[in-house]
From Swiss-Prot:
GO terms for molecular function: bis(5'-nucleosyl)-tetraphosphatase (symmetrical) activity; phosphatase activity. CDD domains: MPP_ApaH. The gene is apaH. GO terms for biological process: RNA decapping. This is Bis(5'-nucleosyl)-tetraphosphatase, symmetrical. Belongs to the Ap4A hydrolase family. The lineage of its organism: Bacteria, Pseudomonadati, Pseudomonadota, Gammaproteobacteria, Alteromonadales. Pfam families: Metallophos. Transmembrane segments: none annotated. GO terms for cellular component: cytoplasm. InterPro entries: Ap4A_hydrolase (IPR050126), ApaH (IPR004617), Calcineurin-like_PHP_ApaH (IPR004843), Metallo-depent_PP-like (IPR029052).
Amino acid sequence: MAHYFVGDVQGCFAELQRLLAKVDFNPSCDELWAVGDLVARGPDSLATLRYFQSLGDAGKTVLGNHDLHLLALHGKLKRDKPSDNLTPLLNAPDIASLIDWLRQQPLMRELPEHKIIMTHAGVPPQWSLEVLRQESQLVSQALKQSDYLDALISQMYSDTAERWEPSAIGINRLRFCINALTRMRYLYVDGHLDFDCKQPPEDCTNPQLRPWFEFTSALRQSHTLVFGHWAALMGKVNDPKLKALDTGCCWGEYLTLWHLEKDQKITQKRLKKG
């Protein structure tokens, strides 16, 4: 069995298929792990979601911020933007099935035999593996409830839940987990989240900010962390135990696939329109 990890697909389905053809991906014996943000901006979010749903146990994804936003759009909590290219997906006859499938996906996944953890944006350095499991599970439980739109999705948008408070309860606790696992890039030196700076570290001019992965973390020492979200990094992190896989395909760059067993990255340039 081969394990392949793919960066933010964001509707770039043709590029994904090219990548999988390059490695002869076979869902009957291989697994495809996705760092989230399967949808938005690229030309074919519908085909992308249908494909991952069809993979069954051979496909493992986590939720990204755009995937959660899709839940809000489907629930009429947010307005669809033409630039997101999500109208065909939202109007699809099987949208209810796809949304139900998406709601079952977690915020983190583990591959214990290889000591790998996958999330969309990263893991707060304050968190142990036990805390990561616990907090992500709380969000997953909320997403699976029948009132998930009112109880979670309608309240998840907030920049105020930027600091980890172990004593927090209810929506504030869930908000921090969502913010950290799906939106995080930089932290202030005291450890609270910044939501504004998206530049690569070499271009960040705020001396109070550091990338989340530059903070001391026991989890980073014991595990390989696989993540996406931060396209400006273009996969460049100076640590073999960090796998940054978002390389900006939906922005005209390329899609990256990491073959775990060979520790090899394979890329596919964004295809030209038409």
